[in-house]
């Protein structure tokens, strides 16, 4: 009764806490969004300590309930209460869970809630921790016995039984062992937070019971309640926390639990079929959470070890209970809150990691108690039966209970979980007594053992006990579980607790290992994609526990019992378990021990059949078909070295989980059965598949009756199965009838209404005959390889005939147009040619642009040449708008004014043939018109060249003045050079006209003037028909060599009178100002700033590079001249010096003096310039200029002109 009263007191504290739990817990469950974190923390802290059920917290701590809830770390206490009180975990949900859990579950939930609340919400004093440690040894044994005894009782006990259990627990708390039990219970509720998640799933109906007093007896409560509550706390983020807070108020808790259970059911799609295992992991989690909550501040003493242990426990719990994913924030808060109080306990757990395991097992039991409906919890467990689902993982743990639980207890994860659940008194007790640590391992093993469905979990004493006390952490994780992702079992929550952030981050060290090739992967999606390379089958991912994995094997339903034999301390055993399971190629199964935030891919493998919370969509979906958010992210705690090393790992922040793109199902090509390939060797190992396009049937009777019947066309069978799984035509039809995550044996034919046809052949290539008898409902198809013969496949080639037969054949082509016979007459052809020539002359406006118009006119005149000529001589006829050629544009018919032509020439000289810039300068014409004008002029120039050639008989050496491009070695007509700007532009516009006779062309200033050459200092060639102008005598001398190499007497004129140029003479191409092919006019029309005349010879270039190349010839000439001048000067000085000498020239003694005197003249020769050379006047032109240089000069000019054209 005393205990019961204490329990009631705790309930009062919890009731206050429950109220506060209803508020978002700021301290512990801030992440969970519950208020019980702050306000409850104070009350909860006091209540758990005072509660008789929580051995960790002395009853004087219960007295602390009176303290303001906000004053103490109530958030932590709430978490612990939730972990400790199955009903308290969620004010309504936990109470319902207790009621649903059965008497033992309720009992466990009640004591656990009280103590976990203390663990989670209160940073209980170290004295209480020490007390719990001292009591650990005896309490652990009692807890173990309680867990074993009350495992079944939890399933049976109802709300009334829960009350009795509370009383029993309070009575037990009176003694030292009772206090130890309380401590264990209080710690376990923290881990129960993890297990509470599973219990919440399974025990949702049980928790609705309003009173914890009616729950399980105290002994069962400590073992199961703590872990389940902690788990439930995680599952029911807000509701579970409230329920754990409401451990003192059973009535309020059931209501809240009911609501939370609904949430949990919604969230926890994957009920874990083995609630006991889940409870075991949850108990560990709850213990860790309680320790963390109690020792958030105390974690400092042994942070590395405790964190490592917490990670190990969290990993185990996460592997066992996926609920940790969702309640990660709560787990973090619980750990933080528990760690201060658990500060002393973590060392004990670190000392004996096995102790953590028992506590973890209690946490799992508490979770089960905390979880509202056991069946719901069981479903999550079933869902987590896969390696990826913590709940199923719990079931696996239960099956593996001995090896796995011991291993986990030995693993640092177990201590980490206990340390993270600072509430757990078992941690303290474990420190005090190693036997108690083993008890804890046993208890944890018991919760892990229940691989049963939710009902099976309830049947298990430990499992039910775990389920009864919905630890706030466990409940919270289940709140996260609604996301369809296992949280309690998630490595995030486990590692997150160790780090202070429960489920938020994944352990970067956690990796998944392919069970076939042992390749490591960082995430489940990556592993799933890799498994496609192994035949498209999904193997349960082997989670590589690198840092002392505590997570149970990730394998699906098969629970690796190899872990059971493994010693509890060695963390490595779990990985071996994973490979064995992984070896079994089952449809992608999530390992229960692997913390996963994922919807179970296969309900059967996860024990989903019993899961109520799991949505049907989640069950049906294959793992690969999940959305990116739903894709599981598996991280298994690595095998941890010594605890010290593992302590450092928990400190590391886990990398945030990454979203993985959905990957399509692997290509699955079903091999053709032997019945469909009777003689596969006939195709040299190739397999035959039935074509889905067509399957012509051969009816034997019809062939016998109608021998003339043609065989159906032979189509080679497809090399790949036309019904292979993929995104093709039949993919949806084939996949719809099969379960998710499984690669069904696809039929060889698609599900089409047509009957299946049997592929067979009467004979094969190798000569072997195979007789195939079609089965019932099957029809044979002739697939014997053959060449299809017939009119449909081959053309009949007629016999060769004589070529003369072609004359008899009538042309089958349609006659479109046939010319008149007269057009073939030569005389008529000549008339048409003459007409076109006339049209291109100056007789008609438009000149050469009239050729097309002339042909159109001739067509309209129906071939009458005279009528066409009359039409052309008259004004342009006005065509009707309906005329086909009314809007036709004849090339060259545009009107260009003198200003436009001038601008065009200037732009063409500046930008060459970049007509976009040319048009910008002309502005009044379009780019198309500028292009047309340029090429029309080019065409006219060629025509004009021909006409000039015919008219050049009266002119000696007359050559057409074409563009430098075509003028190459020809000299431009001086008449063209002397044309006025207007005449030249008009010629460009109307170039079709033959150029007027040279005699008619008025003589104007030479192009050099137009170019802008200086009037003075010009040297003009006096040769007949030349008149080339040069700026220097050397240039003129070089030019004179063209006229026979004789020296020409050059005249220097200030101005070159136009009359001195002979009309008929041709101007040298070198002197021609019109070096640009674009100009038919004098260079005077061009902008002087855009031309580059040569200062030596007067040649004009439109590109600086062309002039620079040309100047090299002058430099070479000048260099030769300088050398010759130097020689001449040196010779003259030598002669003068010799004459001045007194002695004989050849006197040896004077030679040195002579040499010295000659040094200065030699130096003077070096500075001689062109003027000095010219003054010497002793050099012949032939000596100064070489023929090869002149040729080079010509070539350079011509090339320059060509490039511009």
UniProtKB/Swiss-Prot annotation:
Biased composition (Polar residues): 406-417, 437-447, 487-498, 604-613
Compositionally biased tracts (Basic and acidic residues): 976-990
Signal peptide range: none
Sequence ranges of Acidic residues compositional bias: 956-975
Biased composition (Pro residues): 551-579
Keywords: Acetylation, Activator, DNA-binding, Metal-binding, Nucleus, Phosphoprotein, Repeat, Transcription, Transcription regulation, Zinc, Zinc-finger
Residue stretches of biased makeup (Low complexity): 291-317, 332-342, 1072-1086
Modified residues (Phosphothreonine): 773, 960
Localisation per UniProt entry: Nucleus
GO cellular component, one term: nucleus
First and last residues of each zinc finger (C2H2-type): 512-534, 1019-1043, 1092-1114
Residue ranges of domain ELM2 in the record: 785-876
SANT domain sequence ranges: 891-942
SS bonds (residue pairs): none
Superkingdom of origin organism: Eukaryota
InterPro entries in UniProt: ELM2_dom, Homeodomain-like_sf, SANT/Myb, SANT_dom, Trans_reg/Corepressor, Znf_C2H2_sf, Znf_C2H2_type
Positions carrying Phosphoserine: 490, 961
UniProt entry tagged with the keyword Acetylation: yes
Subunit structure of this chain's protein: Interacts with CREBBP and EP300. Interacts with DNTTIP1 and DNTT.
Protein name: Transcriptional-regulating factor 1
Organism: Mus musculus
């Amino acid at each position: 009764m005393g205990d019961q009263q204490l329990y009631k007191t705790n309930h009062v504290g919890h009731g206050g806490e429950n109220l506060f739990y209803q508020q978002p817990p700021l301290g512990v469950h801030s992440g969970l969004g519950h208020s019980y974190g702050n306000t409850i923390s104070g009350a909860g802290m006091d209540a758990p300590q005072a509660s008789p059920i929580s051995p960790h917290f002395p009853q004087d701590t219960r007295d602390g309930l009176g303290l303001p809830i906000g004053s103490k770390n109530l958030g932590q206490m709430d978490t612990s209460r939730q972990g400790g009180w199955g009903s308290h975990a969620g004010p309504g949900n936990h109470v319902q869970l207790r009621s649903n859990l059965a008497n033992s579950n309720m009992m466990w939930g009640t004591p656990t809630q009280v103590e976990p609340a203390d663990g989670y919400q209160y940073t209980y004093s170290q004295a209480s921790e020490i007390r719990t440690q001292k009591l650990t040894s005896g309490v652990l044994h009692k807890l173990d016995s309680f867990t074993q005894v009350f495992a079944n009782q939890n399933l049976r006990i109802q709300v009334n039984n829960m009350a009795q259990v509370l009383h029993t627990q309070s009575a037990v708390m009176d003694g030292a062992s009772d206090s130890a039990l309380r401590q264990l219970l209080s710690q376990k509720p923290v881990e129960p937070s993890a297990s509470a998640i599973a219990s919440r799933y399974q025990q949702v109906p049980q928790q609705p019971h309003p009173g914890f007093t009616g729950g399980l007896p105290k002994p069962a409560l400590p073992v199961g309640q703590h872990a389940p509550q902690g788990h439930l706390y995680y599952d029911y983020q807000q509701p579970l926390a409230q329920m754990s807070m409401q451990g003192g108020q059973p009535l309020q808790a059931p209501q809240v639990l009911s609501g939370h259970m609904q949430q949990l059911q919604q969230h926890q799609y994957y009920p874990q079929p083995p609630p006991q295992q889940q409870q075991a992991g949850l108990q560990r989690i709850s213990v860790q959470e309680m320790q963390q909550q109690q020792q958030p501040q105390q974690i400092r003493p042994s942070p590395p070890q405790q964190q490592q242990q917490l990670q190990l426990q969290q990993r185990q719990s996460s592997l066992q209970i996926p609920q940790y994913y969702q309640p990660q924030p709560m787990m973090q808060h619980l750990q933080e809150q528990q760690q201060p109080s658990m500060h002393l306990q973590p060392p004990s757990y670190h000392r004996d990691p096995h102790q953590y395991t028992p506590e973890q097992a209690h946490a799992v039991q508490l979770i089960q108690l905390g979880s509202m409906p056991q069946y719901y919890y069981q479903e999550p467990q079933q869902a987590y039966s896969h390696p990826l689902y913590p709940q199923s993982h719990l079931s696996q743990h239960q099956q593996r209970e001995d090896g796995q639980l011991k291993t986990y207890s030995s693993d640092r994860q177990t201590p980490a979980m206990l340390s993270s659940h600072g509430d757990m008194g078992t941690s303290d007790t474990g420190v005090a007594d190693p036997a108690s640590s083993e008890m804890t391992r046993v208890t944890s093993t018991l919760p892990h053992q229940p691989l049963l469905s939710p009902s099976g979990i309830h049947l298990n004493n430990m499992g039910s006990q775990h389920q009864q006390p919905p630890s706030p952490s466990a409940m919270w994780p289940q709140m996260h579980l609604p996301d369809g992702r296992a949280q309690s079992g998630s490595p995030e929550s486990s590692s997150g607790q160790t780090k202070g952030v429960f489920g938020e981050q994944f352990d970067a060290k956690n990796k998944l290992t392919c069970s076939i090739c042992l390749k490591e992967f960082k995430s489940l999606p990556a592993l799933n994609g890799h498994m496609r390379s192994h035949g498209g089958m999904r193997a349960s991912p082997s989670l590589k526990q690198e840092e002392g994995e505590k997570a149970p094997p990730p394998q699906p339903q098969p629970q690796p019992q190899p872990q059971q034999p493994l010693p509890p301390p060695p963390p490595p055993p779990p990985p071996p378990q994973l490979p064995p399971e992984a070896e079994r190629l089952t449809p992608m199964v999530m390992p229960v021990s692997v913390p996963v935030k994922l919807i179970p891919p296969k309900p059967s493998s996860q024990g989903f059949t019993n899961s109520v919370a799991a949505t049907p969509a989640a069950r049906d979906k294959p793992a690969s078909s999940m959305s990116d958010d739903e894709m599981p992210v598996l991280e298994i705690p690595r095998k941890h070295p010594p605890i010290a090393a593992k302590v450092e790992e928990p400190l590391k922040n886990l990398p945030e989980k990454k979203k993985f793109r959905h990957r399509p199902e692997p290509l699955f090509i079903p091999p053709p059965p032997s019945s469909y390939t009777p003689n596969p060797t006939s195709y040299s190992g190739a397999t035959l598949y039935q074509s889905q396009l067509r399957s012509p049937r051969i009816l034997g009777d019809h062939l016998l009756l109608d021998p003339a019947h043609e065989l159906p066309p032979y189509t080679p069978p497809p090399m790949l199965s036309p019904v292979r799984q993929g995104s093709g035509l039949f993919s949806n039809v084939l996949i719809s009838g099969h379960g998710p995550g499984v690669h069904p044996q696809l039929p060889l034919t698609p599900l089409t209404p047509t009957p299946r046809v049997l592929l067979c052949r009467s004979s094969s290539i190798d000569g072997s005959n195979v007789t195939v008898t079609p089965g019932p409902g099957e029809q044979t198809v002739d697939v014997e390889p053959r060449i299809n013969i017939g009119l449909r496949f081959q053309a009949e080639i007629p016999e060769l005939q004589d070529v003369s037969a072609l004359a008899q054949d009538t042309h089958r082509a349609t006659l479109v147009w046939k010319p008149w016979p007269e057009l073939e007459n030569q005389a008529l052809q000549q008339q048409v040619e003459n007409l076109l020539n006339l049209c291109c002359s100056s007789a008609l406006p438009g000149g050469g642009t009239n050729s097309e118009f002339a042909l159109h006119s001739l067509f309209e005149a129906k071939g009458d040449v005279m009528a066409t000529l009359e039409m052309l001589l008259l004004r342009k006829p006005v065509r009707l708008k309906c005329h086909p050629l009314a809007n036709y544009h004849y090339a060259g018919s545009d009107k260009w004014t003198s200003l436009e032509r001038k601008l065009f020439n200037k732009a063409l000289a500046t930008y060459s043939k970049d007509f976009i810039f040319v048009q910008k300068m002309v502005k009044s014409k379009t780019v198309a018109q500028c292009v047309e004008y340029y090429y029309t002029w080019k065409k006219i120039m060629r025509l004009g060249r021909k006409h000039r050639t015919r008219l050049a008989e009266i002119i000696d050496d007359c050559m057409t003045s074409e563009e430098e491009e075509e003028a190459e070695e020809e000299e431009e007509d001086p008449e063209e050079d002397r044309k006025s700007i207007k005449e030249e532009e008009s010629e460009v516009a109307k170039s079709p006209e033959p150029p007027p006779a040279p005699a008619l062309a008025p003589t104007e200033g030479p192009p050099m003037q137009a170019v802008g050459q200086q009037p003075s200092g010009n040297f003009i060639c006096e040769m007949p028909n030349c008149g080339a102008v040069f700026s220097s005598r050397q240039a003129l001398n070089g030019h004179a060599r063209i006229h026979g190499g004789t020296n020409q007497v050059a005249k220097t004129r200030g101005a070159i009178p136009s009359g001195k140029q002979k009309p008929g003479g041709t101007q040298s191409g070198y002197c021609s100002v019109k070096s640009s092919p674009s100009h038919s006019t004098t260079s005077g029309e061009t902008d002087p700033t855009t031309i580059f005349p040569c200062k030596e010879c007067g040649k004009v270039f439109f590109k600086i590079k062309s002039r620079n190349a040309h100047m090299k010839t002058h430099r070479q000439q000048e260099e030769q001249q300088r050398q010759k001048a130097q020689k001449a000067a040196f010779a003259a000085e030598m002669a003068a010096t010799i004459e001045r000498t007194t002695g004989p020239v050849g006197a040896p003694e004077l030679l040195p003096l002579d040499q010295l005197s000659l040094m200065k003249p030699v130096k003077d020769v070096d500075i001689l310039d062109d003027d000095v050379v010219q003054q010497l006047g002793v050099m012949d032109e032939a000596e100064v200029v070489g023929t090869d240089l002149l040729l080079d000069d010509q070539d350079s000019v011509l090339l320059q002109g060509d490039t511009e054209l």
